[in-house]
Amino acid sequence: MKIMKYIVPALLGGMLTLQSCEHFLDTKPTETYSEELVWGSRSTADAFVLRTYPDILGLYHDFWGDDQITLNTILRQSCPGEARDLINREHDFGFNKFSIIRRCNLIIEQASASTALSDLDKKELVAEGKMLRAMIYYYQAKHCGRVIWVDRVLQVDDEFNLPLTESIDRTYDLILSDLDDAIAGLPEEYPAGRANANAARALKSEVCLTAAAYTTDATRKKTLWEQAVVAVDAIQGYSLDANYGGMFNQENSYSSTEIILARYFSKENTNGGDTYMQTVIPNQGNDNLKKLGRGPLFKKDWVF
């Protein structure tokens, strides 16, 4: 009896311990999020979409980085090594953006397939994904002309030997198709810093003008010009801001009547240093130009 008295509680304790261990080990990763969670509500889906913006908008305001390999700015004069020696056949010149393209394709596919999102949410998110994808490929098209167009989320067993678009015209046709879908699906108004239908129209007008510049087909060129005009005429609700300086600080940037799409930085987590203006304007005075026999002279001497 004494043996049973001690064995039975021990067995029960062991069973409870094993059961506890089983639940203890049955955990989920805490540093990652499942697709079901991300696309299970509009708020979590928005969080994924908004995290995609910085990688894309940065390509549109870091223009001086590309200019360092051209003769366009003073920046090249300060980095001849980078401009000449480091820019070789191994430099991708903006071609390798496939991780960001994958995020755009995830937005399009996962939002469309979600059973938790409303039809309106799906429509807006898919359109936003296409807008972002068009922005990436337009950036690449300006650099490379022909691109590897990936319009789905690639899996490990997919064929990765993907071809370039057959022509520059085809590249721009695909970009414009995405922009047309974005215009049709995006709301007319969105919170500051997020693309709306007007932002898509504005980008479409620029894409049309760029595409027209690179086509050799006169009929296509005329059609693209006409599409650019239609896109611009359809933009409503914006006007030149009387407070120009306010657009570039917290005084007026969020409520400006001129800004269609911008990337915003908070003073709470942003440190300022060199400005883009310093890298694109020569830090020279007229006295130096005269000494070197150069001209024309600056209307405003010593900008900095």
Residue ranges, per PLM feature:
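Conserved, well-structured interaction surfaces
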Residues: 34, 41-58, 75-144, 160-173, ...
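Alpha-solenoid helical repeat scaffolds
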Residues: 139, 143-146, 152, 185, ...
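Short coil/linker segments at helix-helix boundaries
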Residues: 146-169, 214-226
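C-terminal motif of bacterial Sec signal peptides marking the signal peptidase cleavage site
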Residues: 18-20
